[in-house]
Swiss-Prot record:
Protein name: Thiamine-phosphate synthase
Residues the record lists as binding Mg(2+): 69, 88
Sites where the protein binds 4-amino-2-methyl-5-(diphosphooxymethyl)pyrimidine: 36-40, 68, 107, 136
EC class of the enzyme, as a word: transferase
Gene name linked to the record: thiE
Species name: Cronobacter sakazakii (strain ATCC BAA-894)
């Protein structure tokens, strides 16, 4: 099966998920070329201001910037892509996202949710959470490396992203499963030396294919 939405490279490389325009700026300056803006707890006006600014930055750096959840604003400001959770799929309009030419990523946590994602045929499928994580309340147990590898094998050539509790130390084992990309949060944003952590993760995962 191939994506119905605009395609992404099979390898998106290092894929940080951050919550501010400041982090988007830092990481683009540091050489990251795939990232996601996940905004929480802001007013509608602040959300739109931040999304518009982040998208403009992404375009300036020719980066793959995904907007989490706010698909209407992503379309309005012409983002590279949108990332939706399973619950977001129920309220979003995937056809509108596809018609606008945006890429779509979808979160999954088990085989049933992978089935749901495949029915939509997004640009990539996120597989998580691999390890315990403190950055987001999760309703399910961690998958672990064996289950991640099984999902990657099932999906074959479909672009995949691993997410959830992936640290610098765990990243090599995650990449050995064959997953196309690794999404990280605290491995960068909570690192004592975020710039050094970013460079080491880029050395492991790369910036992604063109």
């Amino acid at each position: 099966m191939t994506p119905l939405f605009a395609p992404v490279p099979h390898r998106l490389g290092l894929y940080p998920v951050v919550d501010s325009v400041e982090w988007v700026t830092r990481l683009l300056d540091a050489g990251v070329r795939t990232l996601q803006l996940r905004i929480k707890d802001k007013t509608d006006a602040e959300v739109e201001t931040d999304i518009a600014a982040a998208i403009a930055l992404g375009q300036r750096y020719h980066a793959r910037l995904f907007i989490n959840d706010y698909w209407r604003l992503a379309i309005k400001h012409q983002a590279y892509g949108v990332h939706l959770g399973q619950e977001d799929l129920e309220t979003a309009d995937p056809d509108a996202i596809r018609r606008a030419g945006l890429r779509l990523g979808v979160s999954t946590h088990d085989d049933m949710e992978i089935d749901v994602a495949l029915a939509v045929r997004p640009s990539y499928i996120a597989l998580g959470h691999v390890f315990p994580t403190q950055t987001k309340q999760m309703p399910s147990a961690p998958q672990g490396l064996a289950q991640l590898a099984a999902h990657v094998k099932r999906l074959g050539d479909y672009p995949t992203v691993a997410i959830g509790g992936i640290s610098l130390e765990r990243a090599p084992a995650v990449l050995e499963t064959g997953v196309g990309s690794i999404a990280v949060v605290s491995a960068i944003t909570q690192a004592p030396d975020w710039r050094g952590a970013t460079q080491r993760l880029l050395e492991l995962a790369g910036v992604g294919d063109e």
